Design a protein with these regions (language model features):
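Charged docking surfaces used in two-component/phosphorelay signaling
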Residues: 20-28
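Active-site residues of response regulator receiver
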Residues: 59
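Alpha4 helix (beta4-alpha4-beta5 surface) of REC/receiver domains from two-component response regulators
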Residues: 69, 73-76, 80-108, 114-121
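The C-terminal output helix
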Residues: 121-136
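Receiver (REC) domain active-site loop signature in two-component systems and cognate sites
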Residues: 62
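Conserved sequence signature across two-component system core domains
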Residues: 12-13, 36, 56
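Acidic catalytic/metal-coordinating carboxylates
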Residues: 37-41, 66-70
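Short hydrophobic/Thr-rich beta-strand motif most characteristic of the beta2 strand and flanking loop
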Residues: 30-37, 45, 107
C-alpha cells in the first residue's frame, strides 16, 4: 500500500500502554496512525493533520473529555469520520446512544489483534456499489 493511499487512524487513550499497543496493531494492519493522550490533544492533532482521518479509535471513559464528547467534536469537523470505541466497562448507555443510534462501533477490552482488525476492516470497508451476479446456468441445462 503506498503512503498516499494509506488510510489514517487516530488512536486516543490516556493509558500509554494501551495507546501504544493499539497504535502498533493498527500500524501492522497497514494504516497510518496518529496518537493522542487526551481529547484536547486529539483535537490539536486532528487540526494539524493536513489530510482526512478515516477512523477515530478512542476509549469511552477518559479524564477531561470523554470518547463520545471527542467523537461529537470531530464529527462536527468531519461528518464522514468513522468511530470505534474501546472500553473495559459496561457501556449500556454508550451502546444505545452512540453505537446503535449513530452507527459507531464498540470493542470491549480485553480484545485480540484479530478482533481489532475485524472491527477496523468492517468500518473502513468501501461501500459496495456493484451489480448482483447470478450463478444460475444458462439454458437450464445441467452438466452430466
Amino acid at each position: 500500500m503506498s503512503e498516499k493511499s494509506r488510510k489514517t487512524v487516530l488512536v486516543v487513550d490516556d493509558e500509554p500502554e494501551i495507546r501504544k499497543l493499539v497504535a502498533a496493531m493498527v500500524t501492522q494492519f497497514g494504516y497510518a496512525v496518529l496518537t493522542a493522550d487526551s481529547g484536547d490533544h486529539a483535537l490539536t492533532v486532528y487540526k494539524n493533520h493536513k489530510a482526512p482521518i478515516e477512523l477515530l479509535i478512542t476509549d469511552v471513559v477518559a479524564p477531561g473529555m470523554s470518547g463520545p464528547m471527542l467523537a461529537d467534536k470531530l464529527l462536527e469537523l468531519q461528518p464522514d469520520l468513522k468511530v470505534l470505541y474501546i472500553s473495559g466497562y459496561d457501556n449500556t448507555q454508550v451502546v444505545r446512544k452512540y453505537v446503535v443510534e449513530r452507527e459507531h462501533a464498540l470493542l470491549a477490552k480485553p480484545f485480540s489483534a484479530a478482533d481489532l482488525k475485524a472491527k477496523i476492516t468492517g468500518l473502513l470497508r468501501p461501500e459496495v456499489h456493484s451489480t448482483v451476479r447470478h450463478a444460475a446456468p444458462r439454458g437450464g441445462k445441467r452438466a452430466g
